[in-house]
């Protein structure tokens, strides 16, 4: 009982407090790594933003690079979860395409810091070298599963890989301002790509 009391403070257990500190650090990391113009991410800056001492940083992360990778993986997990939930809650291929693109826009564009972490940070942050390549298969698989009209497995795989690359470039352009189309037009264009990708080669021809 005494041990339990020592490990509990203000009604919160030690592990819960540790998890809360880790979440606060990750949230600070998203804001810093996803800042417009790419703010410098240092241990000191992260701790200052999270209002925690460096002792608590090293409680959860071995070093700065491990932290940066954890931030990226956290945003990647959020993106996967949002896409899976959107697709699962929709019926027709058209509905699934709209739901998937809308969910990604909501997560990555409405909260641009997350979008910059997932799509832009790997291009500039050495600690993320290869991280985008590691995450890509999960998104390829998700797209792959939606391309049901393509019966040939090789065709489905190649189409899914190409489509993820195209959509990634579109979202990067939308985030950095290269693409200035209205949101509705942007979503409609991405949905059209998804729908066109699901058609067998030459399937629309007579």
PLM region descriptions:
Residues 21, 64, 71, 75, ...:
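Hydrophobic/aromatic residues within well-ordered alpha-helical segments
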Residues 18-29, 46, 71-75, 79, ...:
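Generic hydrophobic, amphipathic alpha-helix propensity
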Residues 107-127, 144, 172, 176:
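Amphipathic alpha-helical segments used for helix-helix packing
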Residues 42, 116-119, 182-183:
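Short, hydrophobic secondary-structure boundary micro-motifs
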Residues 1-9, 141, 145, 173-206:
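C-terminal peripheral helix-coil segments that are non-catalytic and often amphipathic
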Residues 70, 84-110:
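Hydrophobic alpha-helical connector segments
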Residues 126-150, 154-169, 185-188, 192:
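Amphipathic alpha-helical packing segments from all-alpha helical-bundle domains
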Residues 32-66, 70:
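Helix-turn-helix
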């Amino acid at each position: 009982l005494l041990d339990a009391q020592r490990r509990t403070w203000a009604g919160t257990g030690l592990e819960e407090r540790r998890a809360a500190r880790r979440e606060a650090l990750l949230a600070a990391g998203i804001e810093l790594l996803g800042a417009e113009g790419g703010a410098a991410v240092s241990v000191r800056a992260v701790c200052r933003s999270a209002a925690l001492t460096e002792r608590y940083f090293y409680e959860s992360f071995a070093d700065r690079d491990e932290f940066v990778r954890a931030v990226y993986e956290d945003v990647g997990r959020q993106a996967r979860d949002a896409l899976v939930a959107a697709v699962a809650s929709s019926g027709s291929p058209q509905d699934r395409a709209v739901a998937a693109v809308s969910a990604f826009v909501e997560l990555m564009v409405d909260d641009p810091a997350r979008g910059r972490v997932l799509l832009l940070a790997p291009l500039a942050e050495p600690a993320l070298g290869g991280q985008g390549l590691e995450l890509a298969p999960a998104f390829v698989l998700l797209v792959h599963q939606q391309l049901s009209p393509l019966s040939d497995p090789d065709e489905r795989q190649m189409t899914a890989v190409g489509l993820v690359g195209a959509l990634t470039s579109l979202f990067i352009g939308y985030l950095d301002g290269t693409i200035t189309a209205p949101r509705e037009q942007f979503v409609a264009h991405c949905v059209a790509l998804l729908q066109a990708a699901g058609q067998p080669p030459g399937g629309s021809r007579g």
